[in-house]
Amino acid sequence: MIAGFFTRFLFAILLLLPYSQGFFNFQGNQRQQQQQHHQNANPAEGFLSPHEERALSNQCPGYLCPDTEECVDSPSSCPCPFPGSQLKCSLPDGTFVCISKPATDNEDINRKYDDLSGNSKIKFNGVRDCGWVYEMAVKGFST
């Protein structure tokens, strides 16, 4: 009885052996792909991503915003990547962060959030808007 079980077990292992080799050989395949990539790479083409190519070939005389590729005077002038759904919030150190606009049904509040000239100064109690972000930055995000 034990011999029959052992024989079936051995047969099952032998049957699954080719599949297990492919399953457990991830590292070898990864090294092989890396070697092929380096062998096929043309040094003249370089290793730049399309984003890097656009950034390096841009003729911006000022500052090129990394998220939007807009040409502006200074980093603080960069727009948010999605201005229709984001607020640009100023931080105490002069930098900024883009956050999602708070969801509200109040049209007056929505108009204030949509006003790009002043939306970074808005603070409504109980709402995580730019005022809340600024407050948390001053406190050190401890709460």
From Swiss-Prot:
Keywords assigned by UniProt, alphabetized: Signal
Species for this entry: Vanderwaltozyma polyspora (strain ATCC 22028 / DSM 70294 / BCRC 21397 / CBS 2163 / NBRC 10782 / NRRL Y-8283 / UCD 57-17)
Family under the similarity heading: Belongs to the LCL2 family.
Alphabetized CDD domains for the sequence: LCL2-like (cd23996)
Free-text function comment from the UniProt entry: Probable component of the endoplasmic reticulum-associated degradation (ERAD) pathway.
Signal peptide: 1-22
GO biological process: ERAD pathway
Signal recorded as keyword: yes
Name by which UniProt lists this protein: Long chronological lifespan protein 2
InterPro entries, per database record: LCL2
Signal as UniProt keyword: yes
Name of the encoding gene: LCL2
